[in-house]
Structure formats: C-alpha cells, structure tokens
Amino acid sequence: MASQHSRRSREAPRPEMSIGRYTRLDEIGRGSFATVYQGVHTKSKTYVAIKSVNLSKLNKKLKENLSSEIDILKGLHHPHIVALIDCHESTSHIHLVMEYCALGDLSLFIKRRDTLGSHKYTRDMIAKYPNPPGGSLNEVVTRHFLKQLSSALKFLRDRNLIHRDIKPQNLLLCPSPSSYRSGHAQVMPYKGSDDSYEPTTGLESLPMLKIADFGFARSLPATSLAETLCGSPLYMAPEILRYEKYDAKADLWSVGTVLYEMVVGRPPFRATNHVELLRKIEKGEDRIRFPEDNPASDDIKKLIRGLLKRNPVERLNFPEFFSNNVINDPIPGLLADDAPGPPQSPRPRQLVGKAEESPYDTGPEDKLAYPPGQRPVTTHPKSGTPPTATDMRRMGSADRPAPAISKEQQPGGTPPQRPGPVSLATAPGRQELIDRNATTAAMDRQRHRNTYAGAPKASDSTIRAQEARDRAAQEVAFERDYVVVEKRAVEVNAFADELAHSPRLQGGLSRPGQTGAGSRRTTTQGLPTVSPSSPHANAAKAMQVVSGRARADSTHQRQHSYERRYGQSPTSATSAISKALNMASGRLFGMGFSPPLAITKGGRSPPLAYNPFPAYPPVHASLLITGDGSKPNATGDEDCKAVQEIEECATRSDVVFGFAEVKYKQLIPLAPSASTDPSARPMDTNVEPDSADSDDGLTVDAIVTLSEEALVLYVKALSLLAKSMDIAGAWWSRKNREEVYGESPTKDSMSAVAGTRINYVVQWVRSRFNEVIEKAEFVRLKLIEGQRRLPPDHPSHPDNHSISSTAGSSSTADVVVSPGVTAERLMYDRALEMSRAAAINELTGEDLANCEITYVTAIRMLEAVLEDDGMRSMPGSNIERQSSSQGGEKVVLDELQVEDRQVVVKLVSSMRGRLASVRKKVAVLAKRSSAPTPTAGSAGKTPTSNISPVTYATGVTPPR
C-alpha cells in the first residue's frame, strides 16, 4: 500500500498546496468527482487526508449528497468512523480534511493479502495470524474487523442513520493502536477527537477499521422506509434492486456481503448490471455456498446466511445482529499476548471529548475547540463562488444561526428539535416532514444546528404543537404550488396565442396552409397527420380526441407520505413555471424518478401490438441546408438549433403520449361509432366515470394498474411538452430582444421558415398539452374510483392510506400511486420489448420498414427516460452540447445512478447502430427493386413496402 502511494506520487507529482492549517501533499486516490491527497498539519506535523471535490463536476444532486455527507460527518464522532476535521472552500473546490488511514481500504487489504507479510504495519499480524490458502483472511482478523464494523453500525442506528453504501472500498484501515503507542508507526495521524484511535472493541494489535464515505447516508428511523436506489451494485440489498421500499436492514445485507468477501475472498454474487445481479440472487434461493476447503467456522457461516436473506423480513434484524455470539463472544484462537485482560468500564461517549496532551496535538491552538456540528468552515467570499455545503439551499426565517455556544453548554445527547416553518412558496410538501430523504434531513440539520444547541429539551406537547405548525405551513406552501400548475396551462395557451397572432410571424413569415393548420387544431386537437399508406393511419384514426381545455377548478389532490418523491428540476431559462409544474405534478400524481433498470411485473408491459405514434404533422421544408446548399448564417443557425431542439423534445413527448394512449384505450375501449365513444365526448371533471359503463370486463386490479400507468405516463408527457414550450419561449424572447435593441438582422428565407415551423410546432404542443391535461384528469378520477372498489385489505384501498398525510386536507380524495410505478420504468421496459421485436424481424428480414419505425420509437422512448425536466437534453443533442460548453456539468438525474445511466446510454447507442444497419438494408432493397427497366406505367415508382412510410421532420431523427 505504501508502494502504491509512492507510485502515484511519481506518476503525477504535484506541488504542495496550503489549505488552511494544512499542507496538501501527494495524491493517494482518485474518484469520479474528487481526488484524495495526503496532507500534513503545518504545526503538529501529523497527517490528514484531504478530499478535494471539483465543484464544476457536480450537478445539483451530487452537491446535495456532498452537503449531506458534510452535515452528517460533523455530528459523528466515533473511533470506527472516519472523522471530518475541517472543511475549506475555494472558488473551484471544496476541501474536506479528514482522518488519515494509512493502510487504505479493505478491498485492497483483501486483494493484497499475500503481500501483507512484507508490509511494516501488517507483518506482525501475519506472523501471528497467517491467512489460510484460498483467498480469505484469517478468522481472527475477520472477527476483529466485524466487531469494529458492528460497533460503528450500532452507533449509527442509535442515531437513526443508515449508511446505504457499506462495501470494502468504504471501510478504511489504520495501523494498529499498539503500533502508535510503541512508536513503531512512523506516520502519526491527526486526531479528530481524543479517542479517534482507541478502538471500542477488537484487538489493539490488529489494524483498526473505520467507515467512510457518507455521501449516501441519511436519517431513517426504525419505523420508516426509503426507496432511493443508491449504493454499489455488488453489495446492494435485493429489495433495493427490486425498487421496493427498504429500511435499515439494507445495511445488514451489505454487511453480509462484506463478511462473505472477507471469509471467501470474493463477493457472494457477481454480475455486470443490476438486473443480472438480482437474477442471480433470486436464483440462489438463499442457498449461500462456501468452498469445500474454506476454514470458516460454523458460527461465521450461519451469521452470513442469516444476513444474506433475500426477504428483509427473514433477515436478521439489528438487535439480533448486535447480540450474535460472533459479535459479543471473545475471538477464539487468540495468542496469549492478545488474550483479553480484566474488563474495563467503557468510557462515556460525550459529544465533545476533552483534548489531551499527545503527539497529535502540539499546541493549545490546535486542539479541538468546536462542538460537533460547529467546526469551522473556512470560506473565501468571492464573486461567482459556487455554493458551499452550508448554503446549498434557500435561506428562510429559521435559517439565521444563533451564536455558537461552548462545549460546557452543550447538553449531551440532546436530540435536535424540529425547525420552525419556512414561509416559502416552493417549500417542500408534507412528505419531507414525514419521510425525509438524505438531502432534506441534512438541510434541516444544517438549518437548525445552532438554534437548538444549549436549549432545554422540549416537552412532547411543545413538539406536537411545533409539528402542527409545520404541517400548516407546508399545506399553505403546497397550495401555492398547486395554483401554479393551473397557471402553467394558462401560460401555454397564452404563449401559443401570442405566436399565432403575432404580426411579425403572420406578416411575411407565414406560409401557405398556416391558417389551415390553425383550423385543423380546433377540430382534431393535434392528432398526427399520417399518409394513408402509413401503418399508423388506423391507430391515428382510432382515437378521437376530447376538445376543451383543462378546468381551472379541477380538484388536484395531494399525495401520501410514503409516495415517491419527484425531485426538483433545474429552473428553466425562460419560465420557473415548468419547475413548479413538475414538482406539484409529482406530489399530485405520486410520480417519482426511478432508475429504469427493473424486473417487469406481470401485466405491467403493454401488448406488442402497440404501434408508435408518428411525429407531429411533418414539415417538408428543410432548415439545415439552404436552397443553394450553402451553410446558413449565424442567426439562421441559431434558429435551426431552436427548431431542432423543440422538435426533438416534442417528438419524445409524442412517443410517451402514444404509450399512454395504449393504457388509456384499454381503460376506455373504442366503440364502433365515435359518437358513442366515451373518450370522444367532453368530459365533466366534476363527475367521476361510471365504471359499470366503461370497464368492459376489466377487473378492479386491472383498472387500478392501467390508471396508474396511464397517469404517470401522461405526467411525463406533460413535462416534455412544457420543456418544448420553454425552449420556444426562449427563442421568442431572444427574437423580441433583438428587435427592441435593433439587433434583428434582415429577414431572409431562413428566418421565415424557422418562425413558421416554430409557430407550427407551438400550436401542436398547445393542443397536445390541453389534451393530455384533460385525459390525465379523467384517468385520475378513474384511479380514485378503482381504488375505492378494491377489497378493504388491499394496500391501495383508500382506508389503508396514511392518515397523517391527509391531516388538515380539505380535498375529497387523495391520489396515491403504488410504489414502483413510474413512467421511466415503464418506458424502459417497453423500449426493450420493442427493440427485441425489431431485432427478430431484422434477422428474419421481415417488414424492415416497420423495424426502422420501431427502432426510432424505442430510441426516442429511452431518450425520454434520460431526459431531464430542466433545460438539459440527451447526449449528443444540441442542448447538452450547449450546456457542456458552458459549464461542463455532467447530467445525472435525480435518483438515477451513474451506472444505470451508462447502461441506458449504451443501449441507445446499440439501437442506433441497428437502426443504421436497417436503413442500409432498406436502401439496398429499394435500389434493387428500381434496377429493372421501368415500364411506362410504373416509371419512377418504388415499392412502398421498402420505404419508411413516415416522413419525419428535420431534427427528429435520432442524433448520430
């Protein structure tokens, strides 16, 4: 391990850098967003680890994780948890000064088990407890590490914390405490507290284990559940892989995998992705196998099998784990000098220990003088400085810090009190008060850390009164968000009317047929125009669209506390209403972002007969090349980009809408006559649908399932439509600004075509937006009615919904969507099915034209999965190229792990390759069919079966 550090320093020598009271030395580790350096305290000459996080590589979610990690570490002081010593911020980096662990992590320790005998810090350990053959560690060492890991976990559970990323890479090792006392260890680490290197359990002659990396940690009481997919796949609990809600037992599964790896030398389950890993876990059926020659004791094997239970209910719980004889009994097989002596009374754990004279602290100014949670954060106030970990949020009335108090005033073990209400229009809903995620919990602690220090413990009645005030404040904030949702529908229609009646667009920029397009909008409500030969013609005609706008008085309902949370999306460049739409829609419909990799439940996937809807009525004029083939000018190029971005986003929304229509039409089967079709009549949103007339033999469970799936898909389509309108609004604002300041260039054919096309698309988006809102409201009422008809013991029955979440609600009913039902998950599964069907047809050479359409639709659906609801777009699209040039920020969606995103991106890339291959085959067939000398009656004709029947607008084809 020392050789690794020296090799890295030789490969990448860096000049020393001063960071506060510390000097940054050589690099010792590197991750995706941070680099870890060895550092030294300038006065005491003791060593620290400095984790330098590059702020330019962090998006909003990662900054929240960093803030959560800092906030949690400030309040954790335990010998087996890596302590945060200090925190400094510059304009480009946040430097976390942490305890230095000279032996690296446990994964490296296991990997280099055969060379530990030659290492100065571990040679004595190997001499006393040699590792057995086969890749495992000596059981004495394994039990020693397990005892220390369990001590840290008990400390976390006492504080209702769950780590969620327990793995060997996050378990760091320090030289044995005895080596420090004897002076054998030459590298003396800086102490985060007086007992940082005094183990609470285990052997003092063996290396000391510490848990690190609390980026995914969060507060989770014993009775609460979480549902965010996070952690490392190989060590991730199966309930997380199944996208089910989970509790703190997920950490115990990770402990079981780590223990298995120490005993065997490899993880119990290995796979290349989440789906394959879950398949192997399920296939194993809780039969954990060990090599025949493995020397592990029966007690260890029994403990591992108890921890690696697929069903969390059958898994050991924390009291059983902490009381296990492997944890509590003395370690068998110890040598005489390691045998335990007479028991000593445990040292009381104080929030702040009194610093003692030691080689770690050489002067009084270097001793810890700050209570936990009040460590100094050195900031450099400069213009343009990115937000720090302590101000990555809006400041409310409760955010004003109180003066810091001395450690004598800090009551030991005083629990934090609930913060006061924050009067913000965008304040989070009730869910953040009941089932907080890691970010919200961290921000709440950051808000009131200094306000409760030194205050007497509040009585239960005071806490209940405070909770009631909090709920009232959050209700008011939510109502404000709800009003904004309806305002968004008004703004969409107002902007479309503005473009439709703009003298600048109508006076010289309109083209023949523009008026006809407007009239078609009022009659067909934006149904896509297809040619008679298109395979989608019947599908397009089959669905009559409801006329009318969304009702301003329609009653939207709040969601319950255990529903999925829809994270905030970045604020649009032209309108903050889009963000409010997405946030309030999430609370209203229970929509949350879930990583798309999942095992499809029975009955969730739509039938393979689904045909993708084509793009909005195609425009045959090309913007990418002018009439003479020359490159367009700068202004024209900007117009081209705007058109392409709007069309791409609208096309993705159209694909999602088509998928939702499949669910909708299963709920409301089409009658032979459109006049009798319930979906063709204007819907009265004040009257719930008559299930007896429209169910058409569907079971109640099927109605609820279809309604939930249609609802989340319609909400996803709404968010994409809103994004298209925001892009168009940005283009229109720029045009108006140029006109005001006299910067508008001379009108040319390019600008005329761009204005016409954008106006054309905006009118289509407007009518589709109104249509989706209308249908989403109908599906919502259908869902409420279906849930009422469920058996009383069904989890989705209204009587089984959370009561606390509806306290103070004046609404008639709440909309609750089952956990795991998300648009992204449905879209991912559907795209996989479509691509597989297309691949089979491609291999057999059947219906290649339809293969092309299917591939394009599957690609668009996956692009919508990866689509952020802010002003960022897909890899390879103009929006992302623009954002990357501005800040280089990597798009990582809320709750979508980097690994999952990479899997989806690779799948899209593979589909594009297959699409290119199909198009080549279609072109070859078309060329062959036109090779014979044409007759007089068939000159110039080519078989339509070999040509794509849909003409896509420029910018709609997948990015190459």
Swiss-Prot record:
It is an enzyme of class 2 (transferase). Residues 801-815 have a biased composition (Low complexity). ATP binds at residues 28-36, 51. Residues 333-467, 503-538, 550-571, 673-694, 789-815, 926-960 are annotated as: Disordered. One of its GO terms (cellular component) is phagophore assembly site membrane. Its EC number is 2.7.11.1. It is found in: Cytoplasm; Preautophagosomal structure membrane. PANTHER family: NON-SPECIFIC SERINE_THREONINE PROTEIN KINASE, SERINE/THREONINE-PROTEIN KINASE UNC-51-RELATED. Belongs to the protein kinase superfamily. Ser/Thr protein kinase family. APG1/unc-51/ULK1 subfamily. Homodimer. Forms a ternary complex with ATG13 and ATG17. This is Serine/threonine-protein kinase atg1. It comes from Penicillium rubens (strain ATCC 28089 / DSM 1075 / NRRL 1951 / Wisconsin 54-1255) (Penicillium chrysogenum). The gene is atg1.
